């Protein structure tokens, strides 16, 4: 049976990951939060560990078919959820996932892997920009996202929302030193590094013959 828990109090400690979502730092946190029926459904169907789901009492009947028996489901009224998260919330459903173990750059070129089709973002500081890049990368069939040490968090609420949950299936690699790591990537046998620039003199994308292993380098804000 579905593990639906009608809570007596919005102060229940199990709701900790959902509290004050706007007022706290998400970077490197143990858990991440997703908003809305669509993204919660994608999270539940992914290979990531789902800690819990928080549902408005007006939405529980609608989303019940999405919810597996193995995941605790907390049900509260809208005003109680808004008090917990710290802002007006109309989507009615939130999910809490466990952040996957961060992949090191050295794992990127390991043995037994598929051909590398990656995008590298040395210093993307805007969550919506990174989310757009991730969504596009997933649509194009890329299989790796390389982030510089100063890049924003791929598991922030805003990034996940804009990416439409691309982080659930796109492996994310965090560099310790992006310049030296990308130099190592360039030096790896057969790897092609392509830099994307807004320049009318640049070689058009249609003129590039990609290698089996390649990485597109993006600089933006």
Sequence positions of predicted segments:
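Boundary-proximal intrinsically disordered activation/regulatory segments immediately upstream
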Residues: 1-57
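Short acidic-hydrophobic, aromatic-tinged amphipathic segments that line or gate anion-handling sites
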Residues: 6-7, 74-76, 171-178
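RNA substrate-binding interface of SAM-dependent RNA methyltransferases
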Residues: 38, 45, 105-203
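Short, charged/polar "capping" segments at the starts of alpha-helices
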Residues: 58-64, 154-155
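Glycine/small-residue-rich loop that forms an oxyanion/phosphate-binding "nest" at active or ligand-binding sites
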Residues: 75-88
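Glycine-rich phosphate-binding loops that contact phosphosugars or nucleotide phosphates
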Residues: 95
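A contiguous loop/helix-start segment that scaffolds small-molecule binding in enzyme catalytic cores
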Residues: 206-215
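Conserved small/polar residues in nucleotide/adenosyl-binding loops
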Residues: 219-220
